[in-house]
């Protein structure tokens, strides 16, 4: 995730300063509860939808994918691409190009997607606000607004939707300074499903004609 004000009157800020501090504490507490809940899972499997929209530019793109996570390891299927992280290296398989890119954890830090960072990304670089609560498909979803501490950030703010019953992440919305809105929604979540011992093992012999880029 790369990419989080204007007050019309000082008196408005003063009036709500105390309430803001309280809701920020509540928001941080809720996020910590979610992080603890997710960290306790042995495995997670879920589908997700991803929507990128910019009405000014008349852009709307919708995609979906599936991910399996165990501790730091994960397997991601997205846009026809398979990405596997085995705890040491990341393997990105692109069937369309018959190409495989292999990077170490250190090399891959600054690009690509690391779903496990969803647990802790909020802990640094953000201020928190308690936002709206909605009922979605019968589930109470509480949104927390995350505002980047860095004024030069490309992100205006994030909205993290929390399922208040399961204490899980349901939706992540990112609003950029240029008006682009991206929405990631999680569905069909399965917890603690037993996995094969080699589920996150990459076998290059399965791709005999692929170009290996490492």
Regions from the language model: what does each represent?
Residues 64-112, 182-183:
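An acidic-aromatic
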Residues 105-139:
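Flexible, surface-exposed loop/linker segments and immediately adjacent secondary-structure boundaries
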Residues 52, 94-95, 173-176:
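Beta-turn initiation residues at beta-strand->coil junctions
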Residues 17-59, 72-73, 206, 211-214:
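N-terminal leader/targeting segments and the immediate start of mature chains
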Residues 129-212:
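Gly/Pro-enriched, hydrophobic low-complexity segments
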Residues 1-27:
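Bacterial Sec-dependent N-terminal signal peptides
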């Amino acid at each position: 995730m790369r990419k989080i004000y204007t007050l019309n009157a000082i008196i408005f800020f003063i009036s709500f300063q105390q309430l803001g501090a309280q809701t920020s504490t509540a928001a941080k507490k809720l996020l910590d509860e979610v992080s603890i809940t997710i960290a306790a899972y042995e495995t997670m499997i879920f589908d997700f939808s991803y929507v990128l929209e910019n009405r000014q530019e008349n852009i709307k793109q919708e995609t979906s994918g599936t991910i399996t996570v165990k501790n730091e390891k994960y397997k991601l299927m997205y846009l026809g691409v398979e990405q596997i992280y085995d705890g040491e290296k990341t393997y990105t398989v692109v069937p369309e190009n018959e190409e495989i890119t292999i990077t170490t954890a250190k090399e891959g830090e600054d690009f690509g997607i690391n779903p496990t960072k969803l647990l802790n990304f909020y802990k640094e670089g953000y201020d928190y606000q308690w936002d709206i609560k909605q009922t979605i498909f019968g589930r109470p979803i509480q949104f927390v607004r995350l505002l980047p501490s860095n004024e030069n950030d490309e992100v205006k703010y994030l909205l993290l939707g929390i399922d208040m019953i399961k204490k899980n992440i349901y939706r992540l919305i990112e609003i950029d300074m240029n008006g682009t809105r991206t929405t990631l929604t999680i569905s069909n979540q399965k917890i603690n499903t037993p996995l094969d011992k080699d589920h996150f093992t990459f076998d290059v012999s399965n791709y005999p004609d692929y170009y290996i880029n490492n």
